[in-house]
Amino acid sequence: MLVLGIETTCDETAAAVVERHADGSALILSNIVRSQTGEHAPYGGVVPEIAARAHVDMLDGIIASAMKQSGVGFPRLSGVAAAAGPGLIGGVIVGLTTAKAIALVHRTPLIAVNHLEAHALTPRLTSALEFPYCLFLASGGHTQIVAVLGVGNYVRLGTTVDDAMGEAFDKVAKMLGLPYPGGPQVERAAADGDAKRFNFPRPMLGRPDANFSLSGLKTAVRNEAGRIDPLRPRDINDLCAGFQAAVLEATADRLGVGLELFRERFGTPRALVAAGGVAANQAIRGALEGVAARAQTMLIIPPPALCTDNGAMIAWAGAERLAAGLTDTLEAPPRARWLLDANAHAPAGFANTRAGF
């Protein structure tokens, strides 16, 4: 089957065509991504209205390029998939409305894809991976540990109770005066820094649940930076190194607990899988290798270009759902919030947070 995928949930405008074979293997025929980094850099972060307008301006051309590169005409499509959330609602509306128009005109099935599900299923696009497996999803908006039991069948084992991991990296970068996007800047600065200079907290370490918390660590970095005047490049490197080291240790601890919870409830996972933009961080990849080795499980991380937001992951999730007989009507709503695990609740004691969304 051939599926067109459209991604517009944040600041990447993307479209792709993916072919799913009868045996479950896949071939990416095209994958066009246009980042809006230049549009948002002057503001130090994503501006929702600017993002939505950029999607409007670029999406038609990107879809045309993806279709041309794939060599597939619209009549040959088995389905058209769009990220229907969670995300910035203006952008979600742009992508989903476009997909509905294509589905209507060409009488093609519509698949409204949960953006998080697309990340969760990406490892099956790049590897011959069977269910169940344990997913570590870390991005600018989400940090979760999820049991992936099948297409449409997910159980959240842990989540952040405050900041998402990518969000924390970006905020630390901004407070230290590093350019946007901040995550890669922090990683580069940390490589030249002394991680032992500052004794930053390791949040949630040793707790029996698998939840994350990063706001306290972020505040600790701000406090240390505020004591240094002037803030020199060496200081920035050391602060970034200390911050990243704390994140790595906390992540390893939280994932260790998450894997234990997975085994208790679902048996041995076929793999530990990482997805989301933060999974492109090489230091975090190294920490995940250690976690997988200690847990005696295989580690699978898609290529960096498929960890960040892209159209191929949406097309693939659409193909997986289509193969399972899961399609949507033209009434499918755009969603700013959309839980991957519909039965998930906020962690105990954190009912008033945005945890898990």
From Swiss-Prot:
Listed Pfam families: TsaD
EC numbers: 2.3.1.234
Domain of life: Bacteria
UniProt keyword Cytoplasm present: yes
Binding-site residues for substrate, renumbered to this chain: L137, A138, S139, G140, G141, D170, G183, N281
Cofactor: Fe(2+)
Keywords noted in UniProt: Acyltransferase, Cytoplasm, Iron, Metal-binding, Transferase, tRNA processing
Subcellular location: Cytoplasm
GO MF terms, alphabetically ordered: iron ion binding; N(6)-L-threonylcarbamoyladenine synthase activity
Catalytic activity: L-threonylcarbamoyladenylate + adenosine(37) in tRNA = N(6)-L-threonylcarbamoyladenosine(37) in tRNA + AMP + H(+)
GO cellular component, as recorded: cytoplasm
Cofactor detail note: Binds 1 Fe(2+) ion per subunit.
GO biological process: tRNA threonylcarbamoyladenosine modification
Role: Required for the formation of a threonylcarbamoyl group on adenosine at position 37 (t(6)A37) in tRNAs that read codons beginning with adenine. Is involved in the transfer of the threonylcarbamoyl moiety of threonylcarbamoyl-AMP (TC-AMP) to the N6 group of A37, together with TsaE and TsaB. TsaD likely plays a direct catalytic role in this reaction.
Protein name per the record: tRNA N6-adenosine threonylcarbamoyltransferase
Organism encoding this protein: Nitrobacter hamburgensis (strain DSM 10229 / NCIMB 13809 / X14)
Gene label: tsaD
